[in-house]
Amino acid sequence: KLNCNQKIALVGVNGSGKTSIIKLLLRFYDPNEGVILVDNKDIREYTVESLRKCFSPMFQDYCNYAFTVRENVSLSDYNEFENEEKIKYALDKSGAKGFVDNFPGKINTYLTRQYEDGEELSGGQWQKIALSRTFFRDTVMYILDEPSSALDAEAEDELFRQFEDLYKNKGAILISHRLSNVKSADKIIVIDNGKVIEQGTHKELMSLNKKYAHMYKLQAKKYE
């Protein structure tokens, strides 16, 4: 069950089914059993188009397009292609505005060396462009699948600070292996082999002292 003003985190080991849940939510395919409720309504009662308008997802395997920065960002809502203020806002929230402002053509700069004057980006910079595309779209809920996997610690910290501002009046689903990033979620759902084995707040799951607490303590040891 999903309420559109919630901040939800999905956690679990690789292959546990976290991304599959997102694909079910977006109706890339329908469940063989059980139901998914969005605002107390079975998602199969929505048209695919109307359902997907509610979400702005970023998957781990996002694409790097050999387009301009403007085109890369506005792909999620091409009707707003000319809205420079909105593009710059999305770039700022993702942390991409700093390096884009240094390009000679700013947001009209082509990306990749396929173009004579194109700029080649690092993995972390491409990830910020993909995040900008997600944030550019007016939506009810963001879906972020490992959104900081290519970022350094400082950039990751700043990104999650920006998330807090973006989330104020919207919902979010976050998948992250770094459990320190999900502590503030309204609900943390622990997935194992395609099944929900625990759910609750960070405090509640730590007090259970089961799978989530074990994973969190293992990660925390690395920073002692």
Mark where each language-model region is:
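ABC-type nucleotide-binding domain
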Residues: 1-224
